[in-house]
Amino acid sequence: LKNDKDFINKTSVIYNFIDAEEILRKSQEKVTDCCKEKTFTFLNVGRHTEEDKKLTRLIEAAKKLKEDNLYFRILLVGSGNKTQEYKKMVNEYKLENNIIFLGKKQNPYPYFKLADSLILTSEYEGFPVVYLEAMILNIPIITTNVSDSLRIIQNKHGVVTQKNVNSIYNAMKNAIINGISQKEEFDYKEYNQEINEKLEKLINA
């Protein structure tokens, strides 16, 4: 298919619509199971599978941050076949007070409101809807260079790192020391309108 120019010319990449009003509404629920003390907080939301999500990178980066005597917290929302392995790694590195396993959450959005930054350390992704969720809730993003991250995130909604522990660690350290913010507000209405226009164009082609 890559060599079929006619086919390529007739294709278009269309991302997901996003129900921003629902996300904003759900984010107002109160969190009661963590985070009473104020400290710089990273949030990771997703499956605990190492082949793609590579949470070992995040844990290794956290180890280096602790060695620097930096104060931080990482909230892990999700579960998977590597959860127990990750918990063992956290215990071995004595990171129990820094990395909190929250399990799956039917409504993860209140935890976004607790975070100073969303963080993804993946090796590969499709289009991460979690990017859009964070952008709607005005949460800056630290992510490895996957999918469309450079176009969507860099210099607008956060920082894009290389796929290695040192690059992730440096971005996290800089965020803790100097802060991190979205430089552009995400216009979800415009985003959904663009998706709708692409769909109409395909339907009418």
Feature names for model-found ranges:
Residues 155-166, 174-179:
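Conserved acidic donor-binding segment of nucleotide-sugar-dependent glycosyltransferases
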Residues 140-143:
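Short hydrophobic beta-strand element within catalytic cores of glycosyltransferases
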Residues 104, 123:
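Aromatic "clamp/platform" in nucleotide-sugar-dependent glycosyltransferases that forms part
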Residues 2-3, 15-34:
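Acidic anion/phosphate-binding donor-loop and adjacent secondary structure
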